[in-house]
């Protein structure tokens, strides 16, 4: 089988009309503005036909079972298909239109059907097994051997060992799940965009804006004007929503936005995801049972570091036990402050962020908005790029390539005169763009025939507040850490030195280890040398005062106990859900999802949301992303990343040898060996929890 369709590959002979930009192949950068919905179907006609021919050739009896004759030609054809479809997927995420959405959904079953059928192809499976047992396999390097092992594992996980009618049922489930997960994602986007709250331009309206930062007010005004309206327009886009929840003195304004945000895609919405969630869970469970596994949670863990759901649950509960005393202390302090200083004796869900920000300001004498004035995006990028250059001996410069929106920027990473990789930056929120932040690969690294190296290209996407009133975009410190996080993923993809496509970069990396480089990079946003280099006040040009940074640092672990328990709540809900919900549905229970979530909260949470909250209906990570029975990966990988960062703390933050070792043992090797082996090679031992607890301030003082 072949790796996921978002990966890139060597282009094969182009038997296609030259005017279809989706047929360019990964050898050139995408012509995004040339891609139209009407290109998708014809391009897939050509690419699917080419892939079918390559599959037939690979399984033919007279095709030698060697890497060159058997593996590479099929990889070339299928990766060309994957590259084109990856462009369509990407555009559907960042430039959603009714026309593109329609053609995406029309063609999604065609693509899924091909990948599923190839993953179940008995002749191909047998040929891979024969290759695995052949002398030709013994001559392969370690990366190619790992790629073959992954292929064989993925065949089994695709139902290749099933017999009819189970095999056909498995394929049907794959297609239905792809459609349901896409619909879940669309519903979240549409429900987010469906809401607006317009504050009128009156004295009473202006009074409702009290407490909001100037840039949030200006952005709301500009948003209203773009819609041809007067006043201030607030939406559920995060850069619009969160300043209200965090700063607005008007409690009714906070409540209105919270209620809308917490019930996105819920039963009160035309885009209700409740039934979709239940269907997704039932199909995932059936898929696992067809493969002889006890639950989807077990199936999800097969290619991951963790051995079993029980091991994951033990890890999460142990961390919850350690975090709980700190969370209880956090909540008690917040309630006391809110009652005494804010006149809020009974904290509601829409008061939490507001009261927390007020407490932080009172305790540490700064606000997030004050800090934001120092983090202008251009300067932040300069600081981030300078850090990467210093740590890993590369240079980052702006480059030129066609984007999909005027705000998109393009960069190249070089080592001396050698091109290492390139990346697109798309950083501002738009209504036609999926919420959140992510990195995805445009194409992967591989060593091509003739000695040419195809260099990797990445998409880096965030949803920050766009510039207003001619000023540069200003980032909160949370935004800065988000940018560093996604850039860590990008470095993992772009700094790889593995020449085998299926295990280069992030390809083939265990999902519960893939967050290691991203969470590792977050730590640098808390180092004074880096912060000093990337800050200047947007109006005065002055660098951030060290005293302000010291107050930020003192507040770094503010409410860390509450935040840790919240992440554990999500992770334990996810893992429990994928073991229990489908069976409960089959037994006739109406809404086991809410019951399971309530039970998890009763076990681990100290702060419970209101009964109307339907967080799960927009939990795209597990119902539309890659984190189903895998959300624990964030905390699992944080143990690894904190321990890796501790090596820099111990040996010197900018000690060149440590940076070179992290590059060589973690970033460069991609998925070519087990993540635990990469960790041990860097750290010289097994992972330890101590650094995570220390970094989160969850160590009792002596």
Predicted segments, located by residue:
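N-terminal helix-rich structural modules
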Residues: 2-211, 648
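Short, hydrophobic/amphipathic alpha-helical patches that form generic packing surfaces
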Residues: 79-90, 149, 153, 259, ...
């Amino acid at each position: 089988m072949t790796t996921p369709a978002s990966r890139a590959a060597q282009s094969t002979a182009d038997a296609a009309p030259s005017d279809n930009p989706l047929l360019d192949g990964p050898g050139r950068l995408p012509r995004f503005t040339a891609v139209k919905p009407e290109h998708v179907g014809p391009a897939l006609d050509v690419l699917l036909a080419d892939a079918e021919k390559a599959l037939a050739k690979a399984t033919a009896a007279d095709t030698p079972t060697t890497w060159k004759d058997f593996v590479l030609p099929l990889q070339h054809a299928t990766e060309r298909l994957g590259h084109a479809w990856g462009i369509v997927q990407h555009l559907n995420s960042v430039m959603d239109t009714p026309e593109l959405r329609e053609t995406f959904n029309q063609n999604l079953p065609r693509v899924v059907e091909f990948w599923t059928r190839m993953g179940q192809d008995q002749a191909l499976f047998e040929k891979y097994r024969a290759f695995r047992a052949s002398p030709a396999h013994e001559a392969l390097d370690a990366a190619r051997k790992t790629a073959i092992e992954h292929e064989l594992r993925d065949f089994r996980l695709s139902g290749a060992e099933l017999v009819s009618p189970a095999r056909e049922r498995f394929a049907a489930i794959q297609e239905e799940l792809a459609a349901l997960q896409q619909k879940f994602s669309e519903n979240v986007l549409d429900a987010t965009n469906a809401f607006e709250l317009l504050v009128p331009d009156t004295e009473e309206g202006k009074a409702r804006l009290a407490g909001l930062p100037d840039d949030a007010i200006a952005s709301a005004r500009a948003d209203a004007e773009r819609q041809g309206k007067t006043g201030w327009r607030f939406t559920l886009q995060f850069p619009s929503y969160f300043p209200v929840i965090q700063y607005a003195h008007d409690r009714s304004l906070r409540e209105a936005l919270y209620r809308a945000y917490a019930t996105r895609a819920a039963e009160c919405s035309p885009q209700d995801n409740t039934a979709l969630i239940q269907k997704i869970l039932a199909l995932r469970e059936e898929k696992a049972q067809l493969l002889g596994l006890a639950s989807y949670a077990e199936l999800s863990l097969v290619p991951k570091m963790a051995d079993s759901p029980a091991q994951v649950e033990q890890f999460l509960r142990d961390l919850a036990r350690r975090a709980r005393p700190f969370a209880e202390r956090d909540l008690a302090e917040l309630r006391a402050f809110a009652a005494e200083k804010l006149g809020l004796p009974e904290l509601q869900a829409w008061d939490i962020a507001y009261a927390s920000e007020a407490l932080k300001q009172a305790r540490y004498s700064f606000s997030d908005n004050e800090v934001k004035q120092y983090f202008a995006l251009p300067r932040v990028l300069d600081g981030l790029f300078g850090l990467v250059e210093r740590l890993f001996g590369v240079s980052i410069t702006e480059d030129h390539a066609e984007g999909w929106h005027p705000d998109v920027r393009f960069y190249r990473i070089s080592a001396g005169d050698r091109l290492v990789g390139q990346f697109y930056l798309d950083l501002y929120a738009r209504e036609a763009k999926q919420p959140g932040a992510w990195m995805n690969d445009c194409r992967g690294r591989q060593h091509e025939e003739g000695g040419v190296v195809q260099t990797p290209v990445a998409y880096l996407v965030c949803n920050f507040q766009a510039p207003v009133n001619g000023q540069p975009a200003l980032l909160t410190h949370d935004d800065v850490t988000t940018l560093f996080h996604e850039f860590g993923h990008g470095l993992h993809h772009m700094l790889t030195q593995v020449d085998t496509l299926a295990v280069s970069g992030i390809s083939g990396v265990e999902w519960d280890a893939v967050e290691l480089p991203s969470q590792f990079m977050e730590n640098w946003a808390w180092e004074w040398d880096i912060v000093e280099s990337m800050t200047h006040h947007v109006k005065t040009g002055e660098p951030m005062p060290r005293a302000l940074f010291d107050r930020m640092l003192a507040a770094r672990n503010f409410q860390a106990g509450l935040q840790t328990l919240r992440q554990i709540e999500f992770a334990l809900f996810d893992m429990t859900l994928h073991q229990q919900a489908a069976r409960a549905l089959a037994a006739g229970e109406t809404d086991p999802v809410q019951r399971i979530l309530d039970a998890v909260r009763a076990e681990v949470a100290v702060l419970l949301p209101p009964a109307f909250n339907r967080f799960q209906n927009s939990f795209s990570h597990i119902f539309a992303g890659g984190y189903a029975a895998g959300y624990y990966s964030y905390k699992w990988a944080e143990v690894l990343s904190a321990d890796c960062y501790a090596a820099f703390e111990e040996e010197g933050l900018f000690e060149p040898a440590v940076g070179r070792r992290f590059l060589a043992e973690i970033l460069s090797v991609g998925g070519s060996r087990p993540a635990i082996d990469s960790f041990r090679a860097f750290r010289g031992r097994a992972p330890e929890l101590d650094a995570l607890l220390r970094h989160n301030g969850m160590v009792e003082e002596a």
